[in-house]
Amino acid sequence: SIYLRVDWPWAVHNSPLVSMGWHPESGFINSDWKGYDEGMIVYILGLGSPTHPIDPAGWTAWTSTYVWMDYYGKPLVNFPPLFGHQYSHIWIDFRGIQDAYMRGKGIDYFENSRRATLTQRSYAIDNPAQWRDYGPNVWGFTAVDGPHDTTVVIDGRSRQFHTYSARGVAADYVMDDGTLAPTAPGGSVPFAPEIAIPALITMREKYGDNLFTNYGFLDSFNPTFRLPIQPHHGHVVAGVGWFDGDYLGIDQGPIIAMIENYRSDLIWKTMRRNPYVVAGLKKAGFTGGWLGN
């Protein structure tokens, strides 16, 4: 009943794009959902509403802001942090279904997320900035906390570190300060299990209880940050690196949900039966696969 009461057209401030937020004191913020990211599900839900739907032109406007570029030999819709390639996919099974944009590219959004995952690993193997521990099974860049906002010289090289940041790598943007996130490979298990699962296992074995304790993986870690200064939060383990002290639901949820989607399609199967999701996908122009024509 909450979903049926949502006034989606009200949230379309700069038509036909959906606004990212509104404050009672100041009104709409100066940002809309555009450029490929986690906002995909916002448009699907808005389109599928049986009571207050948005105009399908919103989806066309949304896809018109995509950035399609090659990265590490793979053409894809770019978005640097992996969360943008994961969050909508937790709920919606994009395997085998395509909108007009993806039909034009010859892939689906699931394959796009697979490519994004593969390019992150390729970047870590390449390791152009020579951060510690990066490699085939130690990788993962997304929006997480970091150790400190500071610039220091380590082994003769200037290193800039950050606290919270939308870390990520793509053809048009790289934000990398040596901070890695287990939720990045964890949320990509269905897309590329052959690299995501070994990454999780390696992180668990290599860093032990520093990274994986009572409730699973901590938010993030940075093997390069081994400085004798107090981090913004978390702690430094001598000779190993910095480890965050927080468990975040927005980390644990994607790990658990995507592993279960990989195992049993549980969430995907449930959402494929939701008439509003199906309606939203069809209004966005999706066809094929489990949706049919």
Where are these regions (language model features)?
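Ser/Thr/Asn(+Pro)-rich, low-complexity disordered segments
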Residues: 1-293
